Amino acid sequence: MTIKTVKDAINDALVQSFEEDKNVILMGEDIAGGKGREQYQGTQDAWGGPFGVTQGLYTKFGGERVRDTTIAEAGFFGAAIGAAMTGLRPIVELMYVDFAGVCFDQMMNQAAKVRYMFGGKQKVPMVVRTVVGAGFRAGSEHSQTLYSLYTHIPGLKVVAPYDAYDAKGLLLSSIKDDDPVIFMEHKRLYMTSCEVPDDLKPIPLGKGRIRREGSDVTIIAIQRMNLFAEEAADELEKINISCETVSYTHLTLPTSHCV
């Protein structure tokens, strides 16, 4: 058991997936240091994306599997869908979920529909990692969550981890899944930490998590709102109301078994 931040847990899951499956690749803007990195030997992973989540991957696995892209989401999302349909397992980093509009056709009309269009025979095993949430004094176009934008599209699975345990286990499962998964990472949770088993296995998608037992009322929360759910439960306990708290981590499958 090791104390891990959400950021480090995601990095661990990426490394483990790369080591287990040679068909896993990663692409996105500045995930390997940005264009021109060749001039700065030893600093290829200096940035690792806007929040440093992919640091070390380029050095460890090389440029064939960890690829910086141009600022053209429509292009590299289309490339990822094609790669997924022909045997690879691409992980695409959409720098902020706010930029979903520039690659929405690719996700809504291609990735989400391919399995249905081919009678269930064609797989699209790809993961879109993207950052959501406000709280860093960023502009309005870098501060949204847009959960429902994706949950209303049949064919997409939307995963929203809360802590490091969820982040690692759910990302491992998402990468192994044969359908497109939108994996939403809340920027205000990256540096929060908890215990993570060193041998953590993939956590099945579609399972919520009971974080606190209670018998009177149930509070259901997503991502950072779990912090406030716990605070509310503490206040209710003071007036003898036993409160159960449930974290929903898969937003497109019902998790009523938790309630």
Where are these regions (language model features)?
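Thiamine diphosphate
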Residues: M1-P180, M184
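Glycine-/acidic-rich phosphate or pyrophosphate-binding loops and their flanking alpha/beta elements
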Residues: A9-A13, K168-P180, M191-E235
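Hydrophobic, well-ordered secondary-structure elements that form the walls
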Residues: L26, A80, I219, L236, ...
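Short, glycine/serine-rich, charged loops/turns that create anion-binding
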Residues: I31, G133, K187-R188, R224-N226, ...
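Short helix-loop-beta junction
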Residues: G56-G63, F228-T245
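Short beta->alpha junction loops
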Residues: T70-I71, S247-L251
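Active-site proximal loops enriched in glycine and acidic residues that flank catalytic Cys/His/Asp
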Residues: E185, A221-Q223, S247-Y248
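Single conserved hydrophobic/aromatic residue that forms the stacking wall/gate
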Residues: H250-V259
